[in-house]
Amino acid sequence: LLAGFCLAGALSAQAATQEEILDAALVSGDSSQLTDSHLVALRLQQQVERIRQTRTQLLDGLYQNLSQAYDPGAASMWVLPANPDNTLPFLIGDKGRVLASLSLEAGGRGLAYGTNVLTQLSGANAAHAPLLKRAVQWLVNGDPGAATAKDFKVSVVGVDKTATLNGLKSAGLQPADAACNALTDASCASTSKLLVLGNGASAASLSATVRARLQAGLPILFVHTNGWNQSSTGQQILAGLGLQEGPYGGNYWDKDTVPSSRTRTRSVELGGAYGQDPALVQQIVDGSWRTDYDWSKCTSYVGRTTCDDVPGLSDFSKRVDVLKGALDAYNQKAQNLFALPGTTSLRLWLLWADAVRQNIRYPMDKAADTARFQETFVADAIVGYVREAGAAQKELGSYAGQRQQSMPVSGSEETLTLTLPSAQGFTAIGRMAAPGKRLSIRIEDAGQASLAVGLNTQRIGSTRLWNTRQYDRPRFLKSPDIKLQANQSVALVSPYGGLLQLVYSGATPGQTVTVKVTGAASQPFLDIQPGEDSSQAIADFIQALDADKADWLEMRSGSVEVHAKVEKVRGSIDKDYGGDVQRFIRELNEVFIDDAYTLAGFAIPNQAKTPAIQQECAVRGWDCDSETLHKLPGTQHINVDQYAQCGGGCSGNPYDQTWGLNPRGWGESHELGHNLQVNRLKVYGGRSGEISNQIFPLHKDWRVLREFGQNLDDTRVNYRNAYNLIVAGRAEADPLAGVYKRLWEDPGTYALNGERMAFYTQWVHYWADLKNDPLQGWDIWTLLYLHQRQVDKSDWDANKAALGYGTYAQRPGNSGDASSTDGNDNLLLGLSWLTQRDQRPTFALWGIRTSAAAQAQVAAYGFAEQPAFFYANNRTNEYSTVKLLDMSQGSPAWPFP
């Protein structure tokens, strides 16, 4: 009995300690000692119920038994509660969109509509007038049933005064013009009974001024007067009311309305629960997670399982997404919830998720670990980054090991200078956040650029939570973009830590930004600037890599940035480069990155085109050096991680790869090529979506054999089968259709990959023969890239003749659709123009249709017809074995055994 008593007492003391920790964390955000997630959930439930009761009482009194009908139209904005303790929806459409909201912020009373409802009360929204009247009476008197005095003074600012006063009269009220600006004039505010604001309002520190008026007891009615467009002024006014503007487009697409059939009970229910999800809170408190999901409905594709078709799962996921969106709105605005009034419930959500993270253990399985899986699924969506203190997630699974937890951070401010290479994108800062440790960041003058900071670069598919026992890392490693204002410090704490990225838009390409960071950790980071001596940067990188104190590294070279697990890079260096880091870095720059951008003909700083390319451009009067026409594309990011967004490698920006980073690798150049391929160089659009990108690894493999004697991927191009398909197809009554059916008709993503590649290599062999120089063969694709960018961007009338489009009045289309001939046409014209031969016979040989306009243009050149040809080979990289077959008189025998 005594032992039992002592145990109970110890547990009680522990619970009390957690209560105290929770009370303190609600003020500071410091959840590092908070481990009792159930305790936090109970407190959250109590707070949610208090909010529901307050909302229910207010809304029930406002609605009475009046019509709920309301239609703001498509040209309107959503107005959302931001601080849930003190704000609430007033009108929620049938699609769940908030069309008007109420505010009790700062002890005042506010109401905001997503359209100028005051101009609609005598027309489309006449039925809404009685409800608006009660709402205004509540604003002015604090009681929706208490009539406003006759000639109560209304100050109208930023919206048409006459229309506003007439609108209030249409609602059955008797307003009088205050004839002064209660927003900026304190004496006017003291005598006015209502302030009506529109998007035309202005004041110094607008949000703070609105809040001050509210706090002083002046009721505020805001009407959005900017249609479905967002408005900076509106956003500031709403922020002062504790509300927020909806996303771009507002109600334009949803056209949400409150139907006349809506009941008072239903509206009260919707408003009371909005943004709180009491049912989800109840699940968390009770641990009553659903256990009967039909996981057999999940599907798998290239190694990744998805469960979108599991009945009921999407509803659960959407509810969690709503919660995530509400909290991320604060992250994105760099607002610390623990410093904002009216956010107790949101703070409790964050602290609950923090406490859950203290106890997460990987891996988990959706079927075998039902409760843990679903609880973690919710907690993963709830992260508060902007705060002075927080907690680290103790186990990070396949994302990072224990050494990330113990990385030392800087105790003093570091100054970093970053160059923004394009108008928008993101770039590595060169530092990282350590889990649970406070980091402060600020930027100095950014010019006209808008800046934000982000952590990590993984796409959501890099967490394979639906795969069997593969929920083995946090679900949202990449943070939202957190806004940065010039010379204003933002404090961040991440439970996971991660690589810091500067996100930018509206920048002047080439401009520099100074970033100041305190409390950051240093990962191995290599920054190679074109044309600069990088020897010290390389030495520092090698030293950091050899120290082996980080799980992640970054490398920036030209237009490529690599964000990689150290083991994925270290493994390749040791296995493929004998531990020679210098050689690895040199080939990363020259063989992988430079090779691709040079082949595509971009204007690379401090690097001239080859004499052969320069001569071809000069002869044709082409502008091949313009940094406007041929500017390097925006930064290509590469994630090298345990998992990819799709399969083992997944294109995009970033592109993902799961294998070790190898400068000579096929997959690296294949994925990079996806972001360099263009519609004008595709045969049948998407039918060569996995083909036209492969000129980049093909060129690299040819170069690696020639320069290093290593023969890689030597069976990639299937000349033999391509030839066989052509021979069979041309035996039909319609040869072109016969070959098309065999070679191009199959829409499969990877269909006939090696055979279709043979078309692209034909022209390398042809150009090498034409120039009598095997080293110039690949120049044809550089010239075609230079050609297509001029077709795309140069002054059409001035340059079309020089580009071989003299008969085209308008710039031709650029469709990537498989049914289009846009790419076929451009290839026919470009190749005929460059080779000074009519290449229609060879295009027909390959089953490639072209338009009448393209054929007429080629005929207008007056070039000699090039008889149909086929370059045969039994190797991919060795071009000395290539044999030319004349296809104009039949189908010669295959020239290899």
Features from the language model and the residues they span:
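Catalytic cores of extracellular degradative/oxidative enzymes
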Residues: 541-769
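Catalytic beta-strand/loop cores that center a nucleophilic Ser/Cys/Thr
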Residues: 18-107, 121-122, 163-173, 181, ...
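Exposed low-complexity, polar/acidic, P/S/T/G-rich flexible segments that act as propeptides
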Residues: 498-499, 505-558
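Activation corresponds to long, low-complexity, non-globular regions
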Residues: 250-392, 551-571, 579
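Active-site-proximal alpha-helical
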Residues: 273-293, 299, 308-312, 562, ...
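Short alpha-beta junction capping motif
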Residues: 103-117, 129-138, 146-155, 187-232
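Beta-strand-enriched, solvent-exposed domains that form extended recognition/catalytic surfaces
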Residues: 380-525
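Beta/coil-rich, acidic/histidine-enriched accessory regions frequently appended to metallopeptidases
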Residues: 314, 347-350, 358, 362-404, ...
